[in-house]
Amino acid sequence: MAQLDQHICFLLDVATRRITKFYNRRLRPFGITYNHLFILTCLWEQDGVHVKDLAHQLCLDSSSLTGHLDRLERSALVVRQDDPDDRRAIRVVLTAKGRDLKDQLEPIGQELKATLQRGVPPERIQAFTAALRNISNRLE
């Protein structure tokens, strides 16, 4: 019998699926997904980002991001606007509705963070985060 729990890729996949399920269950009442939350989080930190910069931040190709932005735009959470300084560039801007969601959605992320970190010393969390970043960077 395969010892899948010894394979880092399997464990990462299981964790990712469980985290996605956690988020999507809690985000469903707001009409958004886990990926949409990442987009909104980036915009809450820096509104008016160029589409290509947002795609880079999120490690998404432009066609995947476009689909997510289409849905967020239909939900009136963001709008895409031409950049007045560069006619070839498009900026993604939060609407008032998108900005207002922040206070409702941030506790969901805080709940998951508390669950994941419960009983784990901060230095282990930092080491784990560094290891994940290292793995991700090696696969770029």
Task: Tell where the protein language model's regions lie, with residue ranges.
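Short capping segments at the starts of secondary-structure elements
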Residues: 46-50
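Residues within helix-turn-helix
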Residues: 51-52, 63, 70, 90
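Pre-recognition alpha-helix immediately N-terminal to the DNA-recognition helix
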Residues: 18, 22, 38-41, 100
